[in-house]
Amino acid sequence: MSPAPACPLERVSRSSAVPAHYDLRDHDVLDGLNRMVKAGKTRYIGISNCFAWQLAQANALAEREGFAKFVSVQGHYNLIFREEEREMVPYCTQENIALTPYSALASGRLSRLPGQNGTKRASEDAYAKFKYDATAEQDNVIIARVAEQAEKHGVTMTEISLAWLLTKVTSPVVGATKLHHVEGAAKAVELQLTGEELAWLEAPYLPHPLAGVMAQNKPNNAKEKHVWSTGDQKIGS
């Protein structure tokens, strides 16, 4: 974000979406974002890593004050981490709020079988390991099903994983550092999985404890260093 000189945006990060541990009932935060919209600095505002009740409170305040409301939410959501389906997905569906999740491929885990040649990031990304290693055994059951579906359709695991996600959200955030990453994401748009195939991919899923940013989304953690910068916070609900 690049705050306009006249806007009281000191409490809003210049480089990221509004962190969830801001008090989103805070009039000044929402007023500052609204001024950005009115000044033409941005057309719409979105939010990342929040609970559905936090988003509901923020938009209720915005509506009452005549401020711009959050029109999209970016959360952690993929085939092996589906906790957003509990409240956020149905809430956003009802309120017509766009879902644009990150970690669509679970840091590459949904693009290849365990043990296959991975990327340098896959071997060195401590934050991704923090998010996924604790549940690897149960997640690998789903990953194996993704591989089986990919073989059946003659496509990549990336295409299967993203095709599943595209049935749930507005548009996923997909990282790409090579041409085939872009090609795989584009092909997923054309891949249509049947209802039976979708259900089969989903069936082994078990509830996951919150990890990373959302595990830290508590009032008493507001002054802690962000989990992605330290990697030492414990997983918890």
What do these predicted regions represent?
Residues 83-121, 156:
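Aromatic-lined glycan-binding groove of carbohydrate-active enzymes
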Residues 171-181:
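Glycine-rich phosphate-binding active-site loops on the catalytic face of alpha/beta enzymes
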Residues 94, 118-148, 152, 167, ...:
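Terminal-tail/helix-coil boundary detector
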Residues 25, 45, 73, 92, ...:
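Conserved, mostly hydrophobic/aromatic
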Residues 51, 77-81, 103-110, 164, ...:
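Glycine-rich beta-alpha junction loops
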Residues 9-11, 147-163:
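Acyl activation and transfer enzymes in specialized metabolism, enriched
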Residues 1-83, 87:
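Glycine/proline-rich, positively charged
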Residues 30-34, 55-59, 89, 143, ...:
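Generic structural signal for well-ordered alpha-helices
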